[in-house]
Regions:
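Catalytic nucleophile loop
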Residues: 21-22, 45-65
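Catalytic-core regions built around general acid/base machinery
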Residues: 11-14, 35-48
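Glycine/threonine-rich flexible loop motifs
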Residues: 25-35
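C-terminal and late-domain segments of enzyme folds
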Residues: 65-67, 71-178
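Glycine/Thr-rich phosphate-binding loops of Rossmann-like dinucleotide-binding domains
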Residues: 28, 62, 69
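N-terminal beta1-alpha1 cap of cysteine-dependent amidohydrolase-like domains
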Residues: 1-22
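Short, active-site-adjacent cap segments at secondary-structure transitions
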Residues: 26, 58-61, 135-137
Length: 178
């Protein structure tokens, strides 16, 4: 496969800039998970390469990646109507960001419920909602917002998840930074 082709792997391993385009984050991870390409991306990053992505390419940066699918609702919707337990489908991403979950097209597509649900399901992780035409530049523990819109960061400060009646999720003292 192309994900294990030595020429592709070598090209990525020695790259100074890797940019992962949009599309479907699940298809990307299906193609690269466990492959030599995935290892080469991490090696390039450790060697100082800048790794970035847009849309699905931003979503794959997380260790815990939102797939975009709801477990309890059939059919695709860009937003989630409720904040409830076991509704957010996740899978392993590239793991470039190990302490946060990234969601994309955030403000434009009103994905607050989806990211809040993910942060409640994974209370040790921050939720980073990146809007369209906007990016975060992460260097070590610092992040800078650039672009035309906003980045919202949800933190579950008590690192707890509370089940409310009917399978809904709740929490106290969540923090929002814009």
């Amino acid at each position: 496969t192309q994900a294990n082709d030595p020429a592709n792997v070598d090209s990525i391993r020695h790259a100074k800039l890797l940019y992962i385009s949009g599309g479907d984050q699940n298809r990307f991870m299906d193609a690269v998970a466990g492959s030599a390409i995935e290892k080469a991306i991490h090696e390039a990053y450790r060697n100082g390469a800048m790794v970035g992505g847009t849309s699905a390419g931003a979503a794959v940066m997380s260790a815990v990646m939102i797939t975009g699918n709801a477990r309890k609702k059939t059919g695709y919707s860009s937003t989630f109507n409720t904040i409830e337990t076991d509704n957010i489908e996740t899978r392993p991403g590239l793991g470039m960001l190990t302490k946060s979950i990234v969601d994309q097209h955030f403000v434009k597509r009103s994905r607050h419920n989806r990211l809040i649900s993910a942060v409640l399901e994974y209370p040790k992780l921050k939720g980073i909602g990146i809007d369209e035409s906007t990016a975060i530049l992460v260097k070590g523990k610092d992040a800078e917002v650039v672009g035309n819109s906003q980045v919202l960061v949800y933190s579950n400060t008590k690192r707890s998840k509370k089940f409310v009646k009917s399978g809904k999720l709740g929490a106290r003292k969540m923090m929002l930074d814009i």
